[in-house]
C-alpha cells in the first residue's frame, strides 16, 4: 500500500475536507501532490463543490508543501487542536474555493475547462 486519500463531504455547504497519508518508503516522490490534484479536479468538477479544505500538523511541513503546491492558501493555525502521542498539537489550515481553482486552471490552460 502506497497511501490513501479521501474527502469528507459536507453536502449542505458543498464543501469537503481533504485528507491523505503516504507510507514512509514513498515520501518525496510526488504521489500525495498528484493524488490531491486529482481529488481537486473531481471535487470541483464532477461533484460541484464550492470549497475544499485540509489541515496538517504544524510539525509536518512536507504536508504543508503538498497543500501549497496544489494551490491551497494557508488560512490559519488551530492551536493545540489535536491530541497525538499524549501531546496537544497545532494544526495549520489550508483552503481553496471553486472560484480560485477555476481561475488558476484558466491561467495554466487558457480556454480549456
Predicted regions and their residues:
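Acyl-donor (CoA/ACP) binding surface of acyl/acetyltransferases
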Residues: 1-113
Amino acid at each position: 500500500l502506497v497511501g490513501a486519500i479521501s474527502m469528507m463531504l459536507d453536502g449542505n455547504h458543498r464543501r469537503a475536507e481533504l485528507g491523505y497519508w503516504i507510507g514512509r518508503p514513498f515520501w518525496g516522490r510526488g504521489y500525495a501532490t498528484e493524488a490531491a490534484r486529482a481529488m481537486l479536479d473531481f471535487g470541483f468538477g464532477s461533484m460541484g463543490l464550492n470549497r475544499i479544505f485540509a489541515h496538517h500538523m504544524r510539525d509536518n511541513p512536507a504536508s504543508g508543501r503538498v497543500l501549497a503546491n496544489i494551490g491551497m492558501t494557508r488560512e490559519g493555525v488551530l492551536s493545540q487542536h489535536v491530541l497525538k502521542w499524549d501531546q496537544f498539537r497545532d494544526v495549520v489550515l489550508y483552503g481553496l474555493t471553486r472560484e480560485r481553482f477555476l481561475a488558476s486552471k484558466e491561467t495554466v490552460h487558457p480556454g480549456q475547462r
